[in-house]
């Protein structure tokens, strides 16, 4: 999901900084098990913005834009139910054959999984107001946890796909 202030003119912006030395904010109650995530978010974001002509400066008050991140995860439960049918029919051996009735039932599958949420917020540091928001939500798998840098590159690439917006 992408949202931005249509009254803000992004075409004039050339520099960015991160909102603080530690720009990653964790959602309340969320645990970020890997302390390297913040550095990867910063480096990948810097690479993406540099490829689009932005230059990083050290202090947010000297930048055109200030970037921050919010990261969270939640345990979710998915419940799916499916109808089950046992069909009746004719059959039997010898003298006792005949019709057997069927019945309906339901099968329920319950799965627990972890959902991750990464938000990128960009502010106008002079006016101290948000001007752009990007968010990605998805199921976190064991395979993703094995290669977090590749996953973050893909997720941030998708979030920044239309940044800066043309208004």
Regions found by a protein language model. Give the residues of each.
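A short, structured loop/turn motif at beta-sheet edges
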Residues: 10-14, 56-63, 122-129
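C-terminal/domain-edge helix-coil "capping" segments
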Residues: 1-7, 107-167
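Surface-exposed short loop/turn segments
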Residues: 65, 69-129
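Post-signal peptide N-terminal segment of mature Sec-exported envelope proteins
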Residues: 2-24
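Glycine-rich loops and low-complexity Gly/Arg-rich segments
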Residues: 25-26, 41-45, 91-95, 144-148, ...
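N-terminal segment of the mature soluble domain
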Residues: 19-76
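Short, low-complexity, polar/charged sequence segments that are solvent-exposed and flexible
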Residues: 35-40, 85-92, 139-142, 152-155
């Amino acid at each position: 999901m992408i949202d931005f202030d249509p009254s803000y003119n992004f075409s004039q912006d050339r520099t960015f900084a991160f909102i603080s030395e530690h720009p990653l904010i964790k959602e309340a109650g969320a645990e970020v098990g890997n302390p390297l995530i913040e550095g990867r978010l910063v480096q990948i974001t810097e690479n993406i913005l540099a490829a689009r002509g932005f230059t990083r400066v050290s202090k947010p008050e000297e930048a055109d834009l200030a970037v921050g991140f919010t990261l969270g995860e939640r345990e979710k439960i998915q419940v799916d139910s499916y109808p089950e049918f046992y069909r009746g029919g004719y059959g039997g051996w010898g003298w006792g054959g005949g019709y057997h009735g069927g019945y309906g039932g339901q099968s329920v599958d319950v799965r627990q999984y972890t959902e991750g949420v990464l938000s990128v917020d960009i502010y106008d540091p002079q006016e101290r107001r948000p001007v752009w928001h990007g968010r990605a939500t998805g199921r976190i798998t064991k395979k993703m946890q094995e290669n977090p840098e590749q996953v973050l590159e893909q997720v941030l690439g998708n979030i920044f796909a239309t940044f800066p917006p043309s208004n």
